[in-house]
């Protein structure tokens, strides 16, 4: 079924909704994909931009129709029309702003109220920034809800493809699916300290073996 502003294409396509607090970098993230930015359409009835993001896999081309809120979330929650027919989702927070992580459960609840049993990726953005407020080991929500989590840096393109690859594998039911070529991305605006980030990733792995805190606030003590 073609959704508004979604032309029928002869390869698999999926509605991807991106949610999270304002200022977490959702729009910056989506705009990295240059062809999607060039071909985006505005959906005035809901007030979103729909970006068609194409990826090329070993099983052929797939498209994510990526719905971007255009900042409405700053005025409260999003209308159900944003979520309806969503087939996969990304919840984004900013690792330099603790409140954006504390609001992740609310976004998850709103999403799951309308879209049941869809694959969801949690993304901690802005890992290129030095003064992290949310450390890798403090990110536990994905473990409680069985979500995938990736640390990303939209402005440096770090881990850009990983959320899409995870979702593509889940939607295709094929854990061996892989991308055979990279999409054209905007050039990096910042550089990321890969050595420092490798330590964060190690911390993340080590945290998987730790018991979950009863309350997320405990993780910040």
From Swiss-Prot:
Gene Ontology cellular component terms for the protein in this record: cytoplasm; nucleus
Pfam families: Ras (PF00071)
Source superkingdom: Eukaryota
Keyword flag GTP-binding: yes
Keywords from the named record: GTP-binding, Nucleotide-binding, Nucleus, Protein transport, Transport
Annotated SUPFAM superfamilies: P-loop containing nucleoside triphosphate hydrolases (SSF52540)
Region (Switch-II): 71-87
Family: Belongs to the small GTPase superfamily. Ran family.
Subunit (UniProt): Found in a nuclear export complex with RanGTP, exportin and pre-miRNA.
Protein's UniProt name: GTP-binding nuclear protein Ran2
Native species: Solanum lycopersicum (Tomato)
């Amino acid at each position: 079924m073609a959704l508004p502003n979604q032309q029928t294409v002869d390869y698999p396509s999926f509605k991807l909704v991106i949610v999270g607090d304002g200022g977490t970098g959702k729009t910056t993230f989506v705009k990295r994909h240059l062809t999607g930015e060039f071909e985006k359409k505005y959906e005035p009835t809901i007030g979103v931009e729909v970006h068609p993001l194409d990826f090329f896999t070993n099983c052929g081309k797939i498209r994510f129709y990526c719905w971007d809120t255009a900042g409405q979330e700053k005025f409260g929650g999003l209308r159900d029309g944003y979520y309806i027919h969503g087939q996969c989702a990304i919840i984004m927070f900013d690792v330099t702003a603790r409140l954006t992580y504390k609001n992740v459960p609310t976004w998850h609840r709103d999403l799951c109220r309308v879209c049941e049993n869809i694959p969801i990726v949690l993304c901690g953005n802005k890992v290129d920034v030095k003064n992290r407020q949310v450390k890798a080991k403090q990110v536990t929500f994905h473990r409680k809800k069985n979500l995938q989590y990736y640390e990303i840096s939209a402005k440096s393109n770090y881990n850009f493809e990983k959320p899409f690859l995870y979702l593509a594998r889940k939607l295709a039911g094929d854990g061996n699916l892989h991308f055979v070529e990279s999409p054209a991305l905007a050039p990096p605006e910042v550089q990321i300290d890969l050595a420092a980030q490798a330590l964060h990733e190690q911390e993340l792995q080590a945290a998987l073996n730790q018991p979950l805190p009863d309350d997320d606030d405990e993780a910040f003590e």
